[in-house]
Structure formats: structure tokens, C-alpha cells
């Protein structure tokens, strides 16, 4: 009997060793809400300043405008002076490749969403996606936009990838991490469970309950005109969190 019991325990132990480690992320509206994406300067997107060629004194004047966090004010000043901010690239090559795993043109879509967030004050992902459908930065056909819900689909893919382990500075190959889902504590203290096994429900939850957030311009080095190889660029930072209410 002892031999049988020890053998049984050994079998259980072996299975536990071989089984993948899985777990749930906990997010609570009753406490500190950790973001889905907080990549720091790795998550910066670059816009090339075109149109009028600014002299150095003008650039200095633009960069000195407003408070540190008045990114929209500096963007509007560039426009008033005849400049154009045109999406150029993702600042970090690993994050660029990660975003391209969602879609080769997805970085451009995110860039336009960031522009709208700062200039129009829209932060909810669902509202930003609706705005992007009207702008159609990828110039896709109406059938893709409305019948196939292209922009919503791509955004949900991205949010799911973030929730299940994508990070800006780590190479993403489409394979989910050990995270099985979210345990979400709402404002009433109720615990809701969203599992990756039910991807559609999980994706819909993330889409409706996520927002773009503004990080520190000083810490993440964005929101100013910067010169690189004779060209001026203006960076915007991508940070995504869950709604706090």
C-alpha cells in the first residue's frame, strides 16, 4: 500500500512538473489599476514634421510652449505655423515588429488614434475606434470597415495580445503567455472572470473597458520636436489602461 501511495504521489508530482504554469491577472477598480500597456519610451510613435521648414528659433519657441504635459498645445502650434505632423514609424524596432504581427499597417492606425486622443480629447478605445472608422487612415474599402468591422477587429486583437502577454520590448511571436485571463473586481466589489478560452467575450470586455492614457512627457521623452539626421520628429506615447469606473 505504501508503495502504491508513493507511486501515485510520484505520478501526480510528475504531471504537475509537466503541466504549464497558468494564472489570472487581477485588476480592481477598488485599488490601483495597473495598465495593459505601459512601455515607457519603447512605446513611442514618431511623426515627421513636414510642410514648412522651421528655423531653430521657431522650434525652440514651439518646444517651450505651455506646460510639460500640454502636448496638444504644441501640436496645434505646429499646425498654426504651417507644419504638418505625418506618421512616420515606431521608435523601437522590436515594438514595431510586434505591432506588425497584428497587421502590417496597424502602427499607422495606432498613430492616428494617438493624434485623435491628444487633439480631440477622446480616450476610450471604443470611441477612438469609431473616430478612426470615419477618418479611415488606412484608406480601406467601406465594406471592410462596416461589414467586416476591420478597425474594431484589429483593435480587439491588439488588446487581447496585450492582456495575454505582449510587451513592447519583448519579441512577440503570437504565442500566448501563461496568463489564462483576468479576474476583474468592479466598483461594487463583484469579481468577474474573463478567460482566454472564451476569446470573444474577453475581447469585447477589453474593447469596451479600455482607454488610452497620457504618461509623463519627461519620463517617456515625447511631445516635443526633436532633430534626427536633419529631420524634425514629434513623438507620441502609447499607454493603455482599463477604465477606472
Regions found by a protein language model. Name each.
Residues 2-9, 13:
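Single conserved hydrophobic/aromatic residue that forms the stacking wall/gate
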Residues 12-13, 25, 100, 193:
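Generic recognition of cysteine residues
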Residues 146-245:
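Extended, amphipathic alpha-helical scaffolds
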Residues 18-19, 29-185:
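Acidic, metal/cofactor-coordinating or nucleic-acid-engaging core segments within structured domains
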Residues 2, 21-24, 45-46:
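Generic ordered-secondary-structure signal
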Residues 16, 26-28, 36-64, 210-245:
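Compact beta-rich and alpha/beta scaffold cores in large eukaryotic transport/transcription complexes
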Residues 7, 22-28:
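Conserved catalytic cores of phosphodiester-cleaving nucleases, focusing on short active-site segments
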Amino acid at each position: 500500500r505504501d508503495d502504491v501511495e508513493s507511486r501515485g504521489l510520484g505520478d501526480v508530482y510528475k504531471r504537475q512538473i509537466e503541466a504549464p504554469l497558468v494564472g489570472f491577472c487581477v485588476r480592481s477598480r477598488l485599488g490601483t489599476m495597473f495598465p495593459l500597456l505601459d512601455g515607457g519610451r519603447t512605446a513611442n510613435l514618431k511623426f515627421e514634421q513636414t510642410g514648412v521648414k522651421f528655423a531653430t528659433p521657431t522650434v525652440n519657441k514651439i518646444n517651450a510652449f505651455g506646460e510639460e504635459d500640454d502636448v496638444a498645445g504644441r501640436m496645434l502650434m505646429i499646425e498654426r505655423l504651417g507644419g504638418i505632423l505625418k506618421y512616420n514609424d515606431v521608435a523601437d524596432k522590436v515594438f514595431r515588429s510586434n505591432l506588425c504581427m497584428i497587421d502590417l499597417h496597424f502602427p499607422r492606425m495606432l498613430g492616428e488614434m494617438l493624434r485623435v486622443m491628444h487633439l480631440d480629447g477622446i480616450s476610450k478605445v471604443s470611441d477612438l475606434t469609431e473616430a478612426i472608422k470615419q477618418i479611415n487612415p488606412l484608406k480601406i474599402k467601406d465594406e471592410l470597415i462596416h461589414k467586416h468591422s476591420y478597425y474594431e477587429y484589429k483593435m480587439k486583437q491588439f488588446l487581447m495580445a496585450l492582456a495575454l502577454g505582449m510587451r513592447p520590448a519583448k519579441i512577440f511571436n503570437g504565442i500566448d503567455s501563461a496568463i489564462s485571463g483576468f479576474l476583474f473586481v468592479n466598483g461594487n466589489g463583484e469579481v468577474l472572470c474573463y478567460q482566454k478560452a472564451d476569446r470573444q467575450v474577453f475581447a469585447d470586455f477589453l474593447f469596451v473597458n479600455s482607454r488610452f492614457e497620457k504618461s509623463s512627457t519627461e519620463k517617456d521623452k515625447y511631445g516635443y520636436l526633436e532633430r534626427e539626421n536633419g529631420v524634425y520628429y514629434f513623438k507620441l506615447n502609447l499607454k493603455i489602461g482599463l477604465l477606472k469606473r
